[in-house]
């Protein structure tokens, strides 16, 4: 076999392959064997029909077609390996010449990973938010905890802000009661904003047994997005009573003996959260700076696939669970269809570029992934998906996604290596030492790498089709 490569553009090549006919022998033998098992010829046992009889009865062309279909993937793969290409997706194959007994010639056009040069990135500088926990932050945190321990007691008076009501609801659209628009015994706190727009105004001033009707746009269910006439009946009004902020409350709501200890712990927890946010912010901003330094051409077909994947996931998974369609979602977001298309395309481009650049860094820095690192990443992914580590690991193995997880960890390490060499300052002008936030930094880096892995999954699916 002889092959040559023609570069069509930075992300696409054309392979020209010439195969001497004798190299088709194994595929021809397999073709005759396959046809032998599929046909019956009088006078011959099944599977024992001579090749010349098959040629006479069914045509040499049918045999050649079967042999070529069997041989093409192998010769294509050999040509790719010989040229040391990194193909993306399925090739477009064209058989240019097939002469029985002489030669098989074909071309294959395919997208490839572009060649990327990573420049010196040690001079990257970014600014992040300072980690500052104010007294107001601590007060708000403790107050939220206090709210969780509030008690309620029924009262015989008109409902007011902060009261907890027990409600019966009924929604009509075009005069018809919705099957999923009836709910009894619903608990609702006035001012929480957890139910329908307009409900606070409708129930304020009502006592137990009171009833009101108002119009509101439904947020979910079979008539999501439609205007409905909602009838609400108050069956109980209860006042909320907050516990006193003292040592007794600290003992009730935590493992601490004093309110001072509880407040100190809240301050520490808030600082840890802000440090994680700071590490995430540093990762994202360093990544943006890195992408600005590197010229990364993006294959158009890969980009189209990534855009379609993102749209599909949004419409059929996220919005589907919320009972929304894309049109209603854009309305709630205050975006036009054109703005959505632009944002989706930009996010897809960034995801693909991120994957290409970080993968190149993994090779350049010779980064490896240990079993311990992979296990830790798997456990984080399991927690974020709401699955047990064992369930998640089993699903990953069954779906053949272990290499994807390895890639996510490796890319996370590559990005962490770039951040380590970058200068990170907070808004106060102070140098941020991310070594003190190693765990947060690693998790943030792997989150970015996981986002970038969407494109790789699309690549792998396409490559599976090619190999098949």
Curated annotation (Swiss-Prot):
It is found in: Cytoplasm. Its EC number is 5.2.1.8. Consists of 3 domains; the N-terminus binds the ribosome, the middle domain has PPIase activity, while the C-terminus has intrinsic chaperone activity on its own. It catalyses: [protein]-peptidylproline (omega=180) = [protein]-peptidylproline (omega=0). One of its GO terms (biological process) is chaperone-mediated protein folding. This is Trigger factor. Residues 162-243 form the PPIase FKBP-type domain. Residues 428-468 are annotated as: Disordered. The keyword Cell cycle applies. Belongs to the FKBP-type PPIase family. Tig subfamily. One of its GO terms (cellular component) is cytoplasm. Residues 432-453 have a biased composition (Acidic residues). One of its GO terms (molecular function) is ribosome binding. NCBIfam families: tig (TIGR00115). InterPro entries: PPIase_dom_sf, PPIase_FKBP_dom, Trig_fac, Trigger_fac_C, Trigger_fac_C_sf, Trigger_fac_ribosome-bd_bac, Trigger_fac_ribosome-bd_sf, Trigger_fact/SurA_dom_sf. Involved in protein export. Acts as a chaperone by maintaining the newly synthesized protein in an open conformation. Functions as a peptidyl-prolyl cis-trans isomerase. Residues 454-468 have a biased composition (Basic and acidic residues). HAMAP family: Trigger_factor_Tig (MF_00303).
């Amino acid at each position: 076999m002889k092959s040559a490569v023609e570069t069509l553009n930075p992300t696409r090549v054309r392979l020209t392959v010439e195969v001497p006919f004798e190299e088709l022998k194994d595929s021809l033998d397999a073709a005759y064997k396959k046809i032998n098992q599929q046909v019956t010829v009088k006078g011959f046992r099944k599977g024992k029909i001579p090749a010349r009889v098959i040629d006479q009865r069914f045509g040499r062309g049918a045999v050649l077609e079967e042999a070529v279909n069997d041989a093409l993937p192998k010769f294509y793969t050999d040509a790719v390996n010989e040229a040391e290409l990194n193909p993306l997706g399925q090739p477009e194959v064209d058989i240019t010449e097939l002469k029985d007994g002489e030669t098989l010639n074909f071309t294959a056009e395919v997208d490839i990973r572009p060649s990327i040069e990573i420049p010196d990135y040690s001079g990257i500088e970014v600014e992040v938010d300072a980690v500052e926990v104010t007294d107001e932050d601590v007060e708000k945190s403790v107050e939220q905890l206090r709210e969780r321990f509030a008690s309620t007691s029924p009262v015989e008076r008109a409902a007011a802000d902060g009261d907890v009501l027990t409600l019966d609801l009924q929604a009509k659209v075009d005069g018809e009661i919705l099957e999923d628009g009836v709910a009894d015994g619903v608990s609702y706190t006035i001012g929480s904003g957890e139910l329908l727009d307009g409900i606070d105004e409708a129930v304020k001033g009502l006592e137990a047994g009171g009833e009101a009707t108002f119009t509101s746009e439904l947020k979910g269910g079979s008539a999501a997005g439609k205007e409905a006439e909602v009838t609400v009946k108050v069956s109980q009004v209860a006042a909320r009573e907050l516990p006193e902020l003292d040592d007794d409350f600290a003992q009730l709501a935590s493992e601490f003996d004093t309110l001072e200890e509880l407040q100190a712990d809240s301050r520490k927890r808030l600082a840890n959260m802000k440090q994680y946010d700071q590490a995430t912010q540093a990762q994202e901003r360093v990544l943006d700076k890195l992408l600005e330094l590197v010229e990364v051409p993006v294959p158009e077909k890969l980009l189209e696939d990534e855009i379609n994947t993102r749209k599909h996931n949004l419409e059929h998974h996220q919005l589907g669970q919320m009972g929304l369609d894309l049109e209603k979602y854009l309305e709630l977001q205050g975006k036009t269809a054109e703005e959505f298309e632009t944002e989706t395309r930009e996010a897809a481009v960034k995801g693909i570029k991120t994957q290409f650049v970080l993968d190149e860094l993994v090779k350049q820095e010779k980064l490896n992934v240990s079993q311990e690192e992979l296990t830790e990443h798997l456990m984080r992914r399991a927690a974020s998906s709401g699955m047990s580590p064992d369930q998640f690991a089993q699903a990953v193995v069954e779906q053949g996604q272990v290499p994807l997880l390895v890639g996510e960890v490796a890319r996370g390490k590559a990005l962490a290596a770039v951040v380590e060499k970058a200068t990170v300052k907070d808004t106060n002008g102070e140098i941020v030492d991310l070594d003190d936030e190693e765990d947060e930094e690693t998790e943030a880096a792997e989150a970015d790498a996981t986002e970038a892995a969407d494109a790789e999954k699309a690549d792998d699916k396409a490559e599976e089709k090619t190999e098949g």
